[in-house]
């Protein structure tokens, strides 16, 4: 990072100093320099490493696109220490760890062919395999009150599975939870038992054929891998430093994992964007993310906006709080 481009604020300098602030929860509105502070901290960590003997850094982001600033920064570095940095989402970390520790997971005998390599399904391939379950059910008259085309129905069923894993309840409860939330015509209640039948058969298909769709990956990691002592020893030695940006955009299960994981890092920076959590339809939970502040030693609030003018900031505040709207 070119130090001549800007002068870091005191908050950014504080966040960058990983030795004096090894466990920091950084929060503030958009455009207050939080990600820039994270880049400064990453630069400080890399420059502190002896040549060729770097400590590993995990940069965790909720969406791959949010890792672009870190990827761009690393692409401009000439130091070998930059090779010690991994920019990952929790989803990509899950997949790596499940693939690496598959022999350990196989020992739990959850799958029909535990010693054969698994196939990781994308959203599209998950919907394809779901259609193999749903089509025969449609032929039997199931989902008779649903007017969605097949691909939309399969997409919704896969989404229900994923949401159950993200929020943290069993896929066996999906039908009952949908039924209890339904306020419409009781004649449509039968569709929820059809939903439960479909997701149960789909999960069985996955277990019989070593198919790992997203919700199953999450369950394997949370319920079997994360609690294993051998895995814990490996993962704690794998990364010494953590930078977790936009934690408010991740679902609760990620925050649960990080609450357990944070004490093992040599240094950690968790960044929370105020008035955010825009991916709530994908499971983002800002309220859950705030729990991470209790697992860090220091909390720092950024206030100086580096991008927006004062009138624009006031307008934004009006949208957030109409009763206390003040425009200069």
List the model feature ranges, each with a label.
Residues 44-55:
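Post-Walker A helix-loop "phosphate-sensing" segment adjacent to the P-loop in P-loop NTPases
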Residues 19, 41-45, 70, 261:
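Hydrophobic residues on the short alpha-helix immediately C-terminal to a glycine-rich phosphate/catalytic loop
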Residues 238-250, 268-269, 275:
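SF2 helicase catalytic motif II
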């Amino acid at each position: 990072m070119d130090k001549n481009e800007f002068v870091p604020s005191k908050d950014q300098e504080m966040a960058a100093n990983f030795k004096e602030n090894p466990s920091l929860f950084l929060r503030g509105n958009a455009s207050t320099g939080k990600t820039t502070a994270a880049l400064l901290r990453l630069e400080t960590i890399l420059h502190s490493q002896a040549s060729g003997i770097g400590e590993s850094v995990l940069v965790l982001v909720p969406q791959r696109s949010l890792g672009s600033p870190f990827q761009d920064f690393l692409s401009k570095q000439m130091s070998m220490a930059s090779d010690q940095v991994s920019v990952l989402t929790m989803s990509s970390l899950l997949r790596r760890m499940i693939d690496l520790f598959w022999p350990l997971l196989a020992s739990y005998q959850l799958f029909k062919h535990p010693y054969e390599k698994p196939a990781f399904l994308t959203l599209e391939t998950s919907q394809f395999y779901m259609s193999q379950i749903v089509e025969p059910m449609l032929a039997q008259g199931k989902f008779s009150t649903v007017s969605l085309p097949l691909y939309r129905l399969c997409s919704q069923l896969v989404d229900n599975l994923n949401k159950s894993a993200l929020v943290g309840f069993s896929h066996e409860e999906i039908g009952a939870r949908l039924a209890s939330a339904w306020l419409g015509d009781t004649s449509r209640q039968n569709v929820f038992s059809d939903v439960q039948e479909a997701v149960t058969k789909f999960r069985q298909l996955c277990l019989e054929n070593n198919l790992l769709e997203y919700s199953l990956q999450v369950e394997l990691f949370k319920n079997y891998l994360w609690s294993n002592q051998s895995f814990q020893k490996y993962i704690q030695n794998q990364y010494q430093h953590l930078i977790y940006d936009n934690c408010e955009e991740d679902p609760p299960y990620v925050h649960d994992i990080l609450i357990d994981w944070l004490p093992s890092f040599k240094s950690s920076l968790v960044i929370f964007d105020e008035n955010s959590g825009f991916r709530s339809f994908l499971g983002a939970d800002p309220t859950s993310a705030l729990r991470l502040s209790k697992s860090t030693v220091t909390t720092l609030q950024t206030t100086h906006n580096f991008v927006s003018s004062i009138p624009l900031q006031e307008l934004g505040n009006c949208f957030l709080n109409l009763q206390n709207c003040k425009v200069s």
